[in-house]
Swiss-Prot record:
Entry-linked NCBIfam families: pheS (TIGR00468)
Family: Belongs to the class-II aminoacyl-tRNA synthetase family. Phe-tRNA synthetase alpha subunit type 1 subfamily.
Superkingdom to which the source organism belongs: Bacteria
Native source species: Caldicellulosiruptor bescii (strain ATCC BAA-1888 / DSM 6725 / KCTC 15123 / Z-1320) (Anaerocellum thermophilum)
Predominant place of localization: cytoplasm
Protein's name in the database: Phenylalanine--tRNA ligase alpha subunit
HAMAP family: Phe_tRNA_synth_alpha1 (MF_00281)
Keyword annotations: Aminoacyl-tRNA synthetase, ATP-binding, Cytoplasm, Ligase, Magnesium, Metal-binding, Nucleotide-binding, Protein biosynthesis
Gene that this sequence comes from: pheS
Cofactor info, note text: Binds 2 magnesium ions per tetramer.
Positions of Mg(2+) binding: 254
Length: 340
């Protein structure tokens, strides 16, 4: 029996020396020390031995079990340490490698232009006023002296949510809300998104941005309007810029005008951009209509005012010689990065 135990120990030592992984070690432990393992079977056979040798054999088997448990523990510790070192090496960070550059965002070109326009008027004493983009028909049309049969009120040009609710077609409703809630003097600009049922092409979009201005006080004249817009044009487009008013019609202003600036590309000599005329239209303006003042509870015999409005996209197109308005909305980084 002693010889069998010695042979078993030698067998275990040989198998242990060939083990190369933690999984092989676990299999070895199950084979020899498991519930159905070889050593367990040997211990069960002790009852069949003569009492004279049973104690000695049991002692040798227990000694072998302790040897195997200790050897397995040592091997397991070694394998775990090796795995730990491999993991450490695989997760090692080389602090000398340059870090990845963080891509920093920038203000969108339309926001840049809108902010610059707003800053010019803020420096002239204007305040910023805002209003809802989902608007009532009354504020968007009726209060602005736009009659029911006006083309702008057609469903083909306006996004109606219900009979009396729509997406505002201009930021003029903000002016109405301010005039109804404040007493003159009133001096505001109202930037924001507006919506019109236009087909998308290089110059049109169903969503775009406007900045409108309003000044109401005693003694405000057309000369004040012209002077204000001349200051804006020179500060935004350059001191050499000239301004021209052309008669026009808007239902909410009287008299009304379309405002041109001397072509910023040819200096008024005539080029492809200005179609040879030397002038480029930038906005509409005029004196606030008497009916609009009355609709807001302001006496037109005491107070007068002027209003103007421009498309932010149009101003940006002109300044940067961009030919397609869709570029502003497509989020193409190749385009946007040019204006950082």
């Amino acid at each position: 029996m002693n010889t069998d135990i010695a042979n078993l120990k030698n067998q275990c030592i040989e198998e242990l020396s060939r083990i190369k992984s933690l999984q092989e070690l676990e299999d070895f432990q199950v084979k020899y020390l498991g519930k159905k393992g070889i050593l367990k079977s040997k211990l069960k056979e002790l009852s069949k031995l003569e009492p004279a040798i049973r104690a000695q054999v049991g002692k040798e088997l227990n000694s072998l079990r302790e040897y195997l448990e200790e050897s397995i523990a040592i091997q397991r510790k070694r394998f775990l340490e090796e795995e730990k070192q491999k993991r450490i090496q695989s997760e090692r960070i080389d602090v000398t490698i340059p870090g990845k550059r963080v891509e920093i965002g920038a203000i969108h070109i339309l926001s840049q232009v809108q902010n610059e326009i707003a800053e010019i008027f803020l420096n002239m004493g204007y305040e910023i006023a805002e209003g809802p983009e989902v608007e009532l028909d009354y504020y968007n049309f009726e209060a602005l002296n736009i009659p029911a049969d006006h083309p702008a009120r057609d469903t083909q040009d306006t996004f109606y949510i219900s009979e009396d609710v729509l997406l505002r077609t201009h930021t003029s409703p903000v002016q109405i809300r301010v005039m109804k809630s404040k007493k003159p003097p009133i001096k505001i600009i109202s930037p924001g998104r507006v919506y019109r049922s236009d087909e998308v092409d290089s110059t049109h979009s169903p969503i775009f941005h406007q900045i409108e201005g309003l000044f109401v006080d005693k003694g405000v004249t057309m000369a004040d309007l012209k002077g204000t817009l001349e200051v804006f044009a020179k500060r935004f487009f350059g001191e050499q810029t000239k301004v021209r008013f052309r008669p026009h019609h808007f239902p909410f202003t009287e008299p009304s005008a379309e405002v041109d600036i001397s072509c910023i590309f040819c200096g008024g000599k005539g080029c492809r951009t200005c179609k040879g005329e030397g002038w480029i239209e930038i906005l509409g303006a005029g004196m606030v209509h008497r009916k609009v003042l009355l609709n807001c509870g302001i006496d037109p015999d005491i107070y007068t005012g002027f209003a103007f409005g421009m498309g932010v996209e149009r101003i940006a197109l002109l300044r940067y010689e961009i030919e397609d308005i869709r570029l502003f909305y497509e989020n193409d980084l190749r385009f946007l990065k040019q204006f950082r």
